[in-house]
């Protein structure tokens, strides 16, 4: 279950300002959110796929840690990102 290359590049350009800025916290959170949304669609069809569910939980945990880091470092960027990704926090 992977995202398309174009989807990844568009996300990187939207949140990282250029295609090589993949390490920015905003970009990492946006990419994880896209992967999580993609996996949620997968689980609507494959309810017993427990191995992938473990990967999903790891992604959610990593995104939560990155969001906590961003909240500590830059609260304005954090609030903009939460609104643009439609996350509840």
From Swiss-Prot:
SUPFAM superfamilies: S15/NS1 RNA-binding domain. One of its GO terms (cellular component) is cytosolic small ribosomal subunit. PROSITE patterns: RIBOSOMAL_S15. It comes from the Bacteria. InterPro entries: Ribosomal_uS15, Ribosomal_uS15_bac-type, uS15_NS1_RNA-bd_sf. One of its GO terms (molecular function) is rRNA binding. Gene3D superfamilies: 6.10.250.3130, S15/NS1, RNA-binding. Pfam families: Ribosomal_S15. Keywords: Ribonucleoprotein, Ribosomal protein, RNA-binding, rRNA-binding. The keyword Ribosomal protein applies. One of its GO terms (biological process) is translation. Belongs to the universal ribosomal protein uS15 family. Part of the 30S ribosomal subunit. Forms a bridge to the 50S subunit in the 70S ribosome, contacting the 23S rRNA. One of the primary rRNA binding proteins, it binds directly to 16S rRNA where it helps nucleate assembly of the platform of the 30S subunit by binding and bridging several RNA helices of the 16S rRNA. Forms an intersubunit bridge (bridge B4) with the 23S rRNA of the 50S subunit in the ribosome. PANTHER family: RIBOSOMAL PROTEIN S15, BACTERIAL AND ORGANELLAR, SMALL RIBOSOMAL SUBUNIT PROTEIN US15M. This is Small ribosomal subunit protein uS15.
